[in-house]
Amino acid sequence: MRSSRSAKVSLVGAGNIGGALAHMLGASQVVKELVLVDVAGGMTEGKVLDVGQALALLGSDVYITGGSDYAAIEHSDAVVVTAGIPRKEGMSREDLLNTNAAVVRNIAENIAKYSPGALVIVVTNPLDAMVWCMYKYSGLPANRVVGMAGVLDSARFSFFLARHMNVSVSSVSAMVLGGHGDLMLPLLRYSTVGGVPVESLIESGRLNRDDIAAIVERTRKGGEEIVKLLKTGSAYCAPAASCAHMLESYVRDKRSIMPCSAYLDGQYGVRDLFVGVPVIIGEKGVEEVVEFPLTAEEQAVFDQSVELIRGSVSAIS
């Protein structure tokens, strides 16, 4: 992979997340070249102009271009996939699965054609099933396909916990496992505030279990809460920042540990599925799955999450 001074990143899907991510990557100058691709070509080109002009004010020379032709993603070092449709009223879970699976399959085939050496970060929902689709249809090695979910869930958990304790969010380190949704599993024994495990803070009386349970539940419903408040959209700044965090670790070979939807081949007792687990992301993509010992209770919740993901994958026709 090229260094950050020459790295090329393509964003497939030029909606709110794609636009916000383009601005973040351009402003931080983590990459040298950005490409936005979307079936809505005119909108994509308009967003390219808007972001490009914003970057000019920031003194960033990151080159940004875009359109509707997948050939533009050729020789990308990384591709972020946000394209897909949200679940609409009256649409069943299976309808959403199969509609977005078809979208992801088309994108996967184009990535295989134009950028088979790229790291692919999938954001499209339902997340864990769509990462599996990308892996299946692109033919890329498992370490080059990953889903963004746990980074976002961890950020939400950290935000809510920091607000509750009235401390800097930089003092909070959170770790979550499992799928992106109601069965997300925060690991309180491995989540810390100022280096002190959350479990220890509960035992010492600084936190109580009811407060933590409420924070966990709000984290699980974090995306839904934002949708209800916005009324006409969904979260995009935090998902974009989560992708930027992953990309920086990859492009700069930082080997940061973060929770992502990654391929499991026996780790945590799971095979042939993409599930949210802690991983090391470096220049080779997902370089290692980090295994934490789980209690019987934690394992039970994790197993439920795995079965939900397995059911989603099985439902794709």
UniProtKB/Swiss-Prot annotation:
GO terms for biological process: lactate metabolic process; tricarboxylic acid cycle. One of its GO terms (molecular function) is L-lactate dehydrogenase activity. It catalyses: (S)-malate + NAD(+) = oxaloacetate + NADH + H(+). Its EC number is 1.1.1.37. Keywords: NAD, Oxidoreductase, Tricarboxylic acid cycle. The keyword Transmembrane helix does not apply. It is an enzyme of class 1 (oxidoreductase). It comes from the Bacteria. NAD(+) binds at residues 13-18, 38, 100, 123-125. Belongs to the LDH/MDH superfamily. MDH type 3 family. This is Malate dehydrogenase.
